[in-house]
A protein has these predicted regions:
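Low-complexity, glycine/alanine/valine/leucine- and proline-rich hydrophobic stretches
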Residues: 147-156, 161-164, 177, 181-184
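Short, charged alpha-helical interaction segments and adjacent helix-coil junctions
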Residues: 2-15, 77-79, 84-89, 173-267
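Pocket-edge structural micro-motifs
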Residues: 128-131, 164-165, 202
Length: 267
C-alpha cells in the first residue's frame, strides 16, 4: 500500500473516531486537564470539582509489585485529594466488577506509605464509561457503594461508577455528555471544550498529522506483538514436539540471548 493511500485511509478512519474510542479520547484529553475536569463535574454532579495543580495524566501506569501492572486511561486528583481512574470500555468484558475492584485496590495500595495502616487514604473513584448499558437497568449512571447489612453506607471512601454511554437524553447534562462521546462530528457536540479538542485532531493539519503518526505507531506496535507471538508459538512448539527446554528451544531458533528473559516470562 502506498504511503498516500495509507494516509487517506487513516484520514477516513480519523473522521469516524469518537471519544468512546479510547485511543482518540486519550489524544483529546492528553495534557488537557480541563476536558477531564468537565467530564468529572458532569458525572459526579459537582461543578466545584477542580483538579489539583491542573493534574491529569492519560495512559497512567500504576505498578503492582505482587501481580500485573495496570495502565489507567485517565488518572486525576482533585483539590480534596480524591483520586480518579477514568476508563473507556467498548466491550462488556473489560468493564467487569472484578476489574473495577482490582483498579480500586491498586489506587489504595499506591497511596499507602511504608508503616501506614490506611488512616489517611483519600477517596477513590473508579469510573467506567461504557459504550453499552452493561448493567442493563436503563440508567445513565450507576453508583456502587458498600453498605452495612444492606442499609447504611459503610463510608470506606472507595467508589465505583458505571456510566451508560448509550444513554439518550439531550435535556440533561449527562445525556449531552454521552451524546458528545458518541458523536464523530465536532460541529454537532454540545460541550465546546470537547468539540474544540475533537475538531483540532479531525479538522486541522497539525491535528491530523498527530493522529496519523499515532495510527502508524499503533500499526508498528501491532506488528511487533505479532512477531513476538509468532516467536513464542515456535518456542512452545519445539518444547512440546522435541522435548526441549525453553533455553534449548530459543537457542535452536536463534533468539538473541538478551531476549531470553522476556520470552521466559511469557511461557
Amino acid at each position: 500500500m502506498s504511503n498516500e493511500r495509507e494516509r487517506l485511509e487513516d484520514l477516513q478512519r480519523i473522521a469516524k473516531f469518537r471519544l468512546l474510542d479510547d485511543d482518540f479520547m486519550t489524544k483529546c484529553f492528553e495534557k488537557h486537564p480541563k476536558c477531564v475536569e468537565l467530564v468529572l463535574r458532569v458525572i459526579m454532579g459537582d461543578n466545584s470539582i477542580t483538579l489539583k495543580d491542573e493534574y491529569s495524566q492519560t495512559q497512567y501506569l500504576i505498578k503492582n509489585l505482587q501481580g500485573r501492572d495496570v495502565r489507567f486511561d485517565i488518572h486525576a486528583v482533585d483539590m480534596d485529594r480524591s483520586e480518579y481512574d477514568l476508563e473507556i470500555q467498548r466491550s462488556k468484558r473489560g468493564a467487569g466488577a472484578h476489574r473495577a475492584r482490582y483498579n480500586s485496590s491498586l489506587m489504595d495500595a499506591n497511596q499507602i506509605d511504608s508503616g501506614d495502616y490506611g488512616e489517611n487514604l483519600s477517596d477513590t473513584y473508579v469510573i467506567f464509561i461504557t459504550e453499552y448499558d452493561v448493567l442493563n437497568k436503563g440508567k445513565a449512571i450507576y453508583k456502587i457503594e458498600r453498605y452495612i447489612d444492606g442499609e447504611n453506607l459503610f463510608h470506606d471512601g472507595a467508589h465505583i461508577i458505571y456510566v451508560n454511554g448509550s444513554f439518550v437524553d439531550d435535556e440533561s447534562a449527562i445525556g449531552r455528555l454521552m451524546h458528545d462521546f458518541r458523536c464523530s462530528n465536532p460541529d454537532n457536540m454540545y460541550y465546546q471544550i470537547l468539540a474544540d479538542r475533537a475538531r483540532f485532531f479531525k479538522k486541522t493539519e497539525e491535528g491530523e498529522q498527530i493522529m496519523c503518526k499515532m495510527m502508524e505507531d499503533m500499526r508498528n506496535t501491532a506488528a511487533q506483538k505479532a512477531a513476538i507471538n509468532k516467536e513464542l508459538a515456535n518456542i512452545k512448539a519445539l518444547m512440546e514436539t522435541m522435548k526441549m527446554s525453553a533455553e534449548q528451544a530459543m537457542k535452536a531458533l536463534k533468539v538473541p540471548a538478551s531476549e531470553f528473559k522476556k520470552y521466559m516470562a511469557m511461557l
